[in-house]
Amino acid sequence: MRITLPSGTPAEIDLSVANPVMGLVIMPDIFGMRPLFDDLVAQLAREWNMAVIAVEPFPNQTLSADIAERMACVPLLSDDAVLRDMHEAADALGVARVGLMGFCMGGMYCHKEARSDRFARISSF
């Protein structure tokens, strides 16, 4: 289900698991939210018994699938805003223990987030 974080950033969330063992925030790659990540959120929630959310890395932007266009937008991202969105996403899950998983560019943000103690586990691909 699509939600909007308090910051205004869209996210895909699955809270269908009755008693999740923990939560998981997913940071997509440079191509952002798309059906692949919508499906991954649902699959990991179901298979790993977790509350899961994925966050759009380029909120308020309409970008094509062109890699050059997206690469040009990366320097415009605010690390503080992306890290804030990750924390807001974790809060939206409603569980105490939350892990973080990032893919490519999202993995870079996992490494940046490692300096905080918000996430119990961090995995970067």
Language-model features, listed with the residues they occupy:
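Primarily recognizes the serine-hydrolase "nucleophile elbow" in alpha/beta-hydrolase
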Residues: 89-125
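Serine-hydrolase catalytic machinery in alpha/beta-hydrolase-like enzymes
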Residues: 1-94
